[in-house]
Every structure is written in structure tokens, then in C-alpha cells.
């Protein structure tokens, strides 16, 4: 939900003081500042808060290390054909990007935030990073044991403390959002992402997921020692056909509710701010456009009040992988209509959403 995203953004404006503009004045309540900001935003500026790009240096590394064929045919690293770094920087300054992921240095994070301050409303960027066992993508940070190793200790307090320390290191490097915990319930040991999970038992996975969320977010997001947690991957991608990541999942309603949905219900009850959708299809419907699960179950039944983010390029995969949408624009329609709030990642999302609304 765009409003939830903006509440978090407004919290990062706490150091500003401008008596003429309420949303920039920390003397007003969050609700007053948020209402003031929303009233000033154009459609383009609202959709920009749903638009995420990969960090500029991450793109440079991909371009440097990938062959021309890999850039054309692989989406495992970020490469935006036809867009230069200066073009993306200008989009930030124009208020057309609301979020980045994988910004790997404080210097780059600060530079991107400086560019965002040039935009009309000066809305800060929301920056996220994969931190599944510590802020390990960033050089010099603490790397903890993988989640499957942590779960084998049966010591939930360790996970809580790791969440606290990870949050400090993530914030210290300019990010506000950690794409963790992974609360997939592992049921096929052939699956290549075993190490990211807390194991095969829904109860244990739920317990460890809750402690990680509490450690990362704490009780008050207004400080500098906590980050947004992200429960992933919603849902049921951990017992795929032939054990292959991204493969479809055929599952009964009973198994879905008794096994795979339980940790997400626990995460919602723990106050998780964000949820990431899964790569896979569930009974023939891609998770990123599964309105029954995203809206009917999570929003209406579980009372999830945070926001959804897609997994890596998965909205476009409704077209290129699942073959349901005829193009990216139609894929966006299906995803946003189902409840998706933010696209990870890249160009053409902003323009297509605006066209669909208009």
C-alpha cells in the first residue's frame, strides 16, 4: 500500500523543520504530515513510490563482469539496456524513482539521497538490501551462519540478537529495509535454497521468523537502529516440481493452510512491515497476481497492513515465464490489481501504471 510506504518515508524526514510545509515539519504528527504530503502528490509521484531500481554501482559491476550474451539473455544481474547511470540519476532528481535495492556503499546511498532532495517534494528514497544472514552483500560487515544453521540451534534468542545487530549494520550503510526473514517451509531437500530457510517445521519456522522480525524492526521505527523486515516468499515455493527453483507448485487448500501460510500469519501478527511474493505459480496462478492469496487471505483474513514488493523481475515474468500476460503492461495490470505495491525492479513500470490508471 502506497500509504504505508509513505508513512515509513515520512519517518525518515524527522530531521527536517519547515514551518511553511507541514510534511517537512517534525513538530506535526506523522498522520498530519502524511495527509499533507499525499495531498500535494501527483499521480506520477505516487506511482514513483512503487518504482524500484538497482543501485548504480551494482549495475556497473554487472556490466563489467557479464558478457554481451549474458546481458542480453540473463536477468540474474541488473542491466538496463538503453539507460545510462546519468539517466537513472536524473530520474531520481525528477522524483520518478522511490526505492533502490543493493546500494552497497554509504557514499552511493548519500549521493542518491542528495539527488532525491532535488525532486519537487524532496521525498527520501527507501533503500533495501538482501541481508538473509547479516548484511553480507556489503564489504566489511558481519556475516552470520545461514538460517538453516541458526534453526538447528533451536535458540530463538540468537536470531533475535542477530536481527538487532544486522539492523544496525544495514542502517549504518544507508539502507532502511532488509529482505529477510525467509519463512518458506522447506519440504523438498532438492530445492537449491535450503540454506535460506529455517527448516521443515511450520512452528519452528514461524518462531524463528518472528524473532528475526522483532530483532530487525524493534517496537519503534523512528530510531536509527532498526529496519523494515520483509517476510518472504509468499507463498509455497519451497516444494516445487522436481525441486527446481521457480517451478510451479500444485497444492491442496489444507496443505497450504496447515504448512505454508502459517509462518506468514505469524509474521503478520508480529507486525512485519513488508512481504515479498514468490517466483512460483500456485495451482496455475502466479504468486504475483494471486488476488485470493495477496488480498483475500493476507489483507482481509490475516489483516496484513504493510506493503508488498515483487521478487526480482517477477512481475515481468507473468509475461515472459508464466505466459499469461501478453506484455509487461498487462502483467503490471494483473499484479497491481491483485494487490502488488512495488516493482523490483527497473524501467517502464512507472509509465505503464500511469497509462493503466488514466
Residue ranges and their predicted role:
Residues 4-13:
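Sec-dependent N-terminal signal peptides
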Residues 16-358:
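Glycoside hydrolase catalytic-domain context in secreted enzymes
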